[in-house]
Amino acid sequence: MNFCSKKGKTCLTDRKRGGKHMPQSMVHIENLVKRYGDLTALNHLELDIREGEIFGLLGPNGSGKTTAINCILSLLKYDRGQIKIFGEEMKPDSYKLKEQIGIVLQNVAVFDELTVQENIDYFCGLYIRDRKRRKELVEDAIEFTGLEDFCKMYPKKLSGGLLRRLNIACGIAHKPRLIIMDEPTVAVDPQSRNKILEGIQTLNHQ
């Protein structure tokens, strides 16, 4: 557990590193500033996350966690600083770079008119065109998230915990090198939360 304080701004992070050698930098942020009018959401943020790490941003609501994630994903324009993913500057048109990232947003983003399996196949298909390979990846994601018994169900019929697992399956099915999650366990029961956290640990070791 690391605690840091800079210019009156504090952050508490939960950090775990796998492997003994110095792994490659996945996310490198320098001097990142983001303002909303008179409100400074990110104040000269410095961050380096390396391959094999599980890294968590912890803080109260409004502390800038989601803003930081949106800036990393190039969903939000920032005022100053630089963000590099795998050593390359992240830009809105960095499509090849974005293919290596799995995104699990705070709000469940799936299609109500598609079944569990169809949703996973759709999101996987955004990155993987080969049907045979995509079928294998979808099956892997379903098995990994424990959704085998719910493949033909529609999202509206799922519990909160199952929806979260579906959200994760959609984000990781294409086997990305980097997975970014925004509060993946929010509003789920303790049992589902533990399963999700165990799954994240398993992903890190694969």
Predicted regions and their residues:
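Conserved ABC ATPase signature
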Residues: E113, Y154-G161
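Conserved ABC ATPase "signature" region
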Residues: D121, G125, K132-F150
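Helical segment within the ABC ATPase nucleotide-binding domain
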Residues: N194-Q206
